[in-house]
Amino acid sequence: MRTNMRYDGIPFRPVTVSKVSDRPRLVILTDVSLSVRATARFTLHLVHGLQSLASSVRSFAFVSDLVEITDLFAEHPLDEALGLVVAGLPAGGVLDVDADSDHGAAFGTFLEQYGSAVNRRTTVIILGDGRNNGRDPNLAAMEEISRRARETVWLTPEPRYSWGLGSCDLPAYAAYCDRVQVVRDLAGLERANDARTEVAQ
């Protein structure tokens, strides 16, 4: 209307405003190593369900190497896609699932190859136990991912008392997360889903 005031209030040219969706974008990084594989299956089911809550979802699986699995969900039935993720390279899978966990290497690869996927509209969800088997946790990469994101959420099957034991670097990673939640079963994932829905609304 303000634009049309110069024409004595007579509508002359319609003025439209493009409405931009405020639904968040999701990036999910899922550890599928042996120690968290059962939980990873549940989480990948959750990822599939979350796609309707976000303007875009990009999904990645890692052990030490990291691969994008977004297209697997688009091109295959869910159970078949899950099989391709966890089957391992000898069985025609997309990832060496028998390697030792290396979150630091995976985060570095993600930042180098896919870092542009994260911006201030992106919520990053990480599933992992934070165990690097003595390798460099690459906190600089974790910090940079978190800095770029709208929110960083870490889901872990590890009980809190074990976070500082052995090769677990989760306490260090937690410093760069907005929320860390213990998820060990379907009920825990449902609670995480409820919290994620609140963020998306």
Region locations from a protein language model:
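A short, conserved beta-to-alpha structural element at the edge of catalytic cores
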Residues: 50-72, 148-167
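Von Willebrand factor type A / integrin I
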Residues: 143-201
